Structure formats: structure tokens, C-alpha cells
Regions:
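Conserved beta-loop-beta element that borders a ligand/cofactor-binding pocket
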Residues: 111, 148-172
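N-terminal Rossmann NAD(P)H-binding glycine-rich loop of SDR-like oxidoreductase domains
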Residues: 3-23
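Conserved Rossmann-fold NAD(P)-dependent oxidoreductase catalytic core, especially the SDR/UDP-sugar
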Residues: 90-139
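Mid/C-terminal beta-alpha module of Rossmann-like enzyme folds, strongest
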Residues: 212-279, 301, 309-311, 315-324
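Short-chain dehydrogenase/reductase
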Residues: 83-89, 126, 136-148, 168, ...
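A conserved pocket-lining segment of Rossmann-fold NAD(P)-dependent short-chain dehydrogenase/reductase
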Residues: 131-135, 184-204, 208, 212
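NAD(P)H-binding glycine-rich loop region in Rossmannoid oxidoreductase-like domains
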Residues: 34-41, 45-90, 98
Length: 324
């Protein structure tokens, strides 16, 4: 089977490309001029230089594809806002529209729980039906939502689409990719204070995300979406587990988000004057104020997906991160 993949040099994309190529599929990956393509080439994956913002640059690689998997996204909250909109909204529309015009059989969007803007304020877990929490806490969340809506417009015209919504993804390899950077920061004692300690978040192991995507391709009917969410824990519980597993020094303080936000009003000019980044951005605090708890029962029952919990996924991750 011929598969065209965007985001193939990213955390999820690279792991997925390896799995698909290992299963004997012909994987064609869209890569930017600055991307490190060596890991893909070592897997025998053909690379095509381009950008989701440039529809014409994808035509050669996408032509003749049986599946298009769109996993590319701009996650950099410190970059220009227009760049994120162009990648996550216009880019998603470009990939889907070209797939439709080329007559691609199936389309899989690798979205994110960011699409939902968070989960209910009472801490209960949301499902694929939502509800969506607005206003969105970050530009990334808003653009992921808008990008998905753009893709769905092409489904109305006949493109056979499925969507997966991974939660916070962790696990080797990639010490600074996915949510490994957060775990690594706690393991190294880089967070002196804990904010949003009682907010609930879903964590999913990278291998389970890849397995979920493969099972969607094998089993899911067109039009179906699946949360790949994993275990729901509070940030406080997560930090305690990291402390037990890796001796991570727990943060000395637990601070209300409102207090941190007020403090940054005075601290931000000092950080800027010293050429340093503040420990929290306004958008990060917006996210920490919300729950991100999601229920992946649909993937477990309809796809037969087994999603490991943190007790199984954290030990190898901590071992990997401590060694890097």
C-alpha cells in the first residue's frame, strides 16, 4: 500500500513511518528543506521536499497514494502567530483538498486533544463528541480546531476521512519531543513550583498512538474519530510517580495559577531585560487552568486497542530520559 505522510520527521510521524515501512508499505514522506531526513532514508522511505502551506509541493509525493496521513503541525507557541495559522489551518485544508482532487482513497488526520480546548470543568472525561471548551486556551488549540473543521469540509464532498486525537504523548525515543520534555524537566528538578497541581490530564504512550493509527487504517469505517488518550492523572500524582521512579526532586511550592499570572506581570520585563524566557507563558497558564481528561473507550472497544497505563509506560520512559 502506498502512503503519503506529512509530519514524518516529527515525534509521532517518525514512529509511525518506521512501523508502516516495517510492515512493507511504501511510505512517501513530505519533509521541509531544513528537516533531518536521515532517519527516514535509513528506513527506505522516499522523501519529498515541500510544505503543507504549498499545495503544489505535495502533488508529486501524494500522486497515486492509497492513504494520506496528515500528521504535520506547528506547535511553537513562541513563533509568529500567522505561521501557526498557515500550517495548522491552511496547511490542513491544502492537504485534504489535494487528496480529494487526486482521488486518494482514504485520509487520516492526526489531530490532538487540543482540538477540544480542554475537558469539562468538573474534571469528568470528555469523549469524541466533546464538549468543546471555548474560548480556546491557546492559539495552537484554536488552530487545531479550525484545521479539523477545514478537513471535514472535504469529507462533505466525498473524501473518506478518519481522525485520531492523541493526548499528551510520551515515551522513547526523543528526549525533548512530545511530552517527554515535560517529564525530563521534572526529573531534572527544573520546576521549582507546581501550578495546576489538581488539574487532570490524559497521558498516552507513543507506541499505543502508533498502534491506534494502524488499527484505524485496518478497521475503522470512514468518518469515525478516535481518542487515543491513555491514563488520566492529576499533575500532582504524575510528579509523585516520577519522584518514586527516578528520584525526581518534587517542586518545593504549589502555587495558584492566578498568583503566578499576577507575578509575571512584574517579572516578565526583568526576564526580557536579561534575555531569558520566563518559566511560564500566558498561554501555558491558560492550559494549566483547564482539565485535559479524555475517555478512549471507543478505541478500546471498536478497534481492540490496548492502551498501557503510566505504571507500565513511565518506567522505560524514565530510564530512557535519565540516560540522555
Amino acid at each position: 500500500m502506498r502512503i503519503f505522510l506529512t509530519g514524518g520527521t516529527g515525534y509521532i510521524g517518525r514512529a509511525l513511518a518506521s512501523r508502516l515501512a516495517g510492515a512493507g508499505h511504501e511510505v512517501r514522506a513530505l519533509v521541509r528543506p531544513t528537516s533531518n531526513t536521515e532517519p527516514l532514508k535509513q528506513l527506505g522511505i522516499a522523501t519529498f521536499t515541500g510544505d503543507v502551506a504549498d499545495r503544489a509541493s505535495m502533488r508529486e509525493g501524494m500522486s497515486g497514494a492509497d492513504w494520506v496521513i496528515h500528521a504535520a503541525a506547528d506547535l511553537d507557541l513562541t513563533g509568529p502567530p500567522e505561521r501557526m495559522r498557515q500550517a495548522n489551518v491552511q496547511g490542513s485544508d491544502n492537504v485534504a483538498s489535494l487528496a480529494y482532487k487526486l482521488g486518494v482513497g482514504r485520509f487520516l488526520s492526526v489531530s490532538s486533544i487540543a482540538y477540544f480546548g480542554g475537558s469539562p470543568t468538573d474534571g469528568s472525561a470528555a469523549t469524541e463528541e466533546g464538549p468543546v471548551q471555548q474560548p480556546f486556551p491557546t492559539l495552537y488549540s484554536a488552530t487545531k480546531h479550525s484545521g479539523e473543521l477545514a478537513i471535514r469540509e472535504w469529507a462533505k464532498k466525498g473524501l473518506k476521512i478518519n481522525t485520531v486525537y492523541p493526548s499528551l504523548v510520551y515515551g522513547p525515543p526523543g528526549k525533548k519531543e512530545g511530552s517527554n520534555a515535560i517529564l525530563r524537566g521534572f526529573l531534572k528538578g527544573r520546576y521549582p513550583a507546581l501550578a495546576g497541581a489538581d488539574r487532570k490530564t490524559s497521558w498516552v504512550f507513543i507506541d499505543d498512538v502508533v498502534e491506534g493509527i494502524v488499527r484505524v487504517m485496518e478497521k475503522a469505517p470512514p468518518g469515525r474519530g478516535y481518542l487515543l488518550a491513555g491514563e488520566v492523572v492529576t499533575l500532582r500524582d504524575l510528579v509523585e510517580r516520577l519522584h518514586r521512579l527516578g528520584g525526581a526532586p518534587p517542586p518545593r511550592l504549589t502555587l495558584p495559577i492566578g498568583l503566578i499570572r499576577a507575578g509575571l506581570v512584574f517579572a516578565n520585563p526583568l526576564y526580557k531585560a536579561r534575555g531569558r524566557k520566563p518559566p511560564f507563558s500566558s498561554e501555558q497558564l491558560n492550559s494549566l487552568e483547564r482539565h485535559w481528561a479524555f475517555d478512549d473507550t471507543r478505541a478500546r472497544t471498536e478497534l481492540g486497542l490496548r492502551v498501557r497505563g503510566l505504571d507500565e509506560g513511565l518506567p522505560p520512559t524514565v530510564e530512557f530520559l535519565k540516560a540522555t
